[in-house]
């Protein structure tokens, strides 16, 4: 595409300690009302005008300050995780560190990045609904713990025994998308495992709050203080989105068709 050709033409492959730093994020974009497109159309309420809403998913090079990929979705069908895996899978970049916020926390996303040969650094939830909640972690404000977690969607009696070791085994239900395990299996089919390698890192950011990060960066090369610094760099994509939408006038698009955005 023209976008990808342009990105490659200005690509200087600037690296941070030998790694290309990419951030991924999403942002909504209003376009002119088009009621013929129900997947993005929102009728006006309380005197407001009707509009159509798109969701832009983008991958941004934090050192070169350029977008290296983007995927536009209609708002009612938006799926940031699907957009992330699509951009990772189709990328021609051989090695990169992908930084992302909590909305991208999923085993499937981590698996796609790992299988690409990239590294990831993603802020994750501290509560009961995320990856960290299923692991036995230190009850401290600061730690750095490695994991080699085997995922399976099988639930035989033997597997249930293995799952008691929750720092080494995890069951993935068939309702959760995971592209590296068979979607269906018969009762007597052998169990299939997919192994994820990562660290869970936690550190305080104030007297009352902590951040929790999942990453597969090598601990000896990137200790905890480097993880703090790298995560702070992720905010560069927030600034770039703000500049794109306000400074460059992306808030005032007149196209009614997604293809023209």
Question: What are these model-derived regions, one by one?
Answer:
Residues 1, 16-20, 24-37, 45-261:
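Single, function-defining residue in the core of a domain
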Residues 13:
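P-loop NTPase switch module centered on the Walker A-proximal segment
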Residues 42:
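Extracytosolic and intramembrane catalytic regions of membrane-associated proteins
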Residues 1-10:
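Internal glycine-rich, Lys/Arg-flanked active-site/core loops of soluble domains
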């Amino acid at each position: 595409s023209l976008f990808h050709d342009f990105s490659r033409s200005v690509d200087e492959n600037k690296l941070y300690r030998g790694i290309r730093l990419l951030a991924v994020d999403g942002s909504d974009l209003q376009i002119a009302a088009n009621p013929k497109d129900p997947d993005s159309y929102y009728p006006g309420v309380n005197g407001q005008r009707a509009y159509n809403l798109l969701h832009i998913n983008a991958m941004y090079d934090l050192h070169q300050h350029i977008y290296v990929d983007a995927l536009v979705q209609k708002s009612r069908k938006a799926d940031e995780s699907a957009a992330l895996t699509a951009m990772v899978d189709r990328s021609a970049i051989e090695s990169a560190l992908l930084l992302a916020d909590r909305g991208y926390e999923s085993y499937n996303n981590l698996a796609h990045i790992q299988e690409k040969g990239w590294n990831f650094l993603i802020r994750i939830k501290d509560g009961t609904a995320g990856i960290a909640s299923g692991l036995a972690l230190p009850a401290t404000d600061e730690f750095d713990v490695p994991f080699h977690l085997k995922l399976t969607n099988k639930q035989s009696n033997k597997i249930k025994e293995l799952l008691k070791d929750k720092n080494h085994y995890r069951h993935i239900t068939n309702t959760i998308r995971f592209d590296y395990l068979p979607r269906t299996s018969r009762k007597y089919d052998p169990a299939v495992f997919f192994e994820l390698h990562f660290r869970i890192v936690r550190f305080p950011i104030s007297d009352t709050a902590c951040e929790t990060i999942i990453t597969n960066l090598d601990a000896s090369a990137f200790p905890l203080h480097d993880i703090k610094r790298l995560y702070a760099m992720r905010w560069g994509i927030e600034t770039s989105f703000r500049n794109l939408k306000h400074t460059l006038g992306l808030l005032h698009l007149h196209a009614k068709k997604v293809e023209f955005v």
